[in-house]
Design a protein with these regions (language model features):
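Single conserved hydrophobic/aromatic residue that forms the stacking wall/gate
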Residues: 1-6, 10
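Short, solvent-exposed loop/turn and secondary-structure capping segments
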Residues: 4, 33-34, 75, 87, ...
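A long, amphipathic alpha-helix that forms part
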Residues: 12-21, 29, 50-87, 97, ...
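Extracytoplasmic/secreted proteins, especially bacterial periplasmic and envelope-associated proteins
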Residues: 13-17, 21, 55, 59-62, ...
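Long, internal low-complexity/basic segments
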Residues: 34-55, 194, 251-252, 256, ...
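Beta-strand elements within well-structured catalytic alpha/beta cores of enzymes
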Residues: 64, 71-74, 78, 87-94, ...
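Secretory-pathway/luminal and periplasmic proteins that interact with or process carbohydrate-rich
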Residues: 96-104, 229-235
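C-terminal cap/loop subdomain of S1 sulfatases and analogous C-terminal strand-loop tails that border
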Residues: 134-165, 172, 176-187, 192-270, ...
């Protein structure tokens, strides 16, 4: 899959090849240059863990292949039972590729497993002394390969830039999807819309109480109108906050980003700059103020901020 001596070249080639493929597919129509700058320019020959890092990406590719095979088995089973055409299949990831480094991890810590299902100890190669591959080794891609995996975007999981929060979704439902079949849509959605979609499809209603207590209304909105007509009245804004990383996206394509508590808001026009290469905050301060005010209102309403122990911004 990958030769360690050539992996730095491969990183550039793979990233560029993915970018060219995205252009061919018309994923970002009307944009001619949406590949963000590489975030790392160090040389592969200076990497003391070159062989380990190359193997980690090879294992990652193999895992994706196994996922693909598993999905194929599900689809074949649905075909055999005659249920495929009337089954809604949604496929997406939960965030961008992770930059986490297993050198900083310990088995049994947080959600990290310390043994396999049959009781074998899992090795966390803090010095990358054991190559990735077997189920008894824990591996990760790290930031450099994540920058490749998240092409064309900047950054990765846990960040509020597109490389962290943009998760394209595939929907398959022959009997239900009536518009733009086999195509793409630029309609904006959120993972919380999935539950709203399921409730809509089931012709059910979201409850207003639980055991005599009022509960908060559902934030998500059904994706069904997009499947049937190609459009819907979606969210006016979508807000994000994770480890003090903040983002706020408007339905007209503007996006605020604040990567730290003490950072200034950054402003991007995703209609023209999908990979967030040009900060327009200084050019459009009124837009920043408008969206920042809306973010504060959203954060308060959804009880995102302030949270216990939160430091002043």
């Amino acid at each position: 899959l990958y030769s360690s001596a050539a992996s730095d070249v491969y990183k550039r080639q793979i990233r560029n090849a993915r970018y060219e493929r995205q252009k061919q597919l018309g994923i970002f129509p009307g944009m001619d240059n949406f590949l963000s700058e590489r975030q790392f320019h160090d040389k592969w020959e200076d990497n003391p863990h070159a062989e380990w890092d190359a193997r980690a990406m090879a294992v990652h590719a193999a895992m994706i292949d196994r996922v693909d095979q598993g999905i194929g088995q599900v689809i074949e089973a649905l075909k055999k039972t005659g249920q495929l055409d009337n089954t809604l299949i949604l496929f997406l990831s939960d965030n961008g590729c992770s930059n986490e480094d297993c050198q900083n991890m310990t088995g049994g810590e947080n959600d990290r497993p310390d043994m396999t299902r049959d009781g074998k100890k899992i090795i966390y190669p803090r010095n990358k002394q054991v190559l990735p591959g077997p189920q008894t080794t824990y591996a990760s891609l790290g930031a450099r390969w994540s920058n490749v995996a998240n092409t064309p975007f900047r950054f990765w999981k846990a960040k509020s830039y597109e490389g962290g929060i943009c998760t394209p979704m595939i929907a398959h439902w022959p009997k239900g999807i009536k518009k733009n079949v086999g195509g793409m849509t630029s309609e904006i959605g959120h993972v919380m819309d999935i539950m709203a979609t399921c409730i809509d499809l089931a012709d059910a209603e979201y409850p207003t109480t639980y055991k005599g207590h009022d509960i908060l209304p559902m934030e998500g909105k059904s994706l069904l109108p997009i499947f049937k007509t190609g459009h819907r009245k979606g969210h006016d804004y979508l807000g994000f906050e994770h480890f003090n990383e903040r983002a706020f996206l408007s339905n007209d394509g503007w996006k605020l980003v604040r990567p730290k508590n003490n950072s200034q808001w950054e402003l991007y026009n995703l209609n023209e700059d999908r990979s967030e290469q040009h900060d327009l905050a200084a050019k459009y301060p009124e837009k920043v103020a408008e969206m920042a005010k809306a973010y504060e209102a959203w954060a308060k309403r959804c009880m995102v901020e302030p949270y216990p122990g939160q430091k002043k911004k």
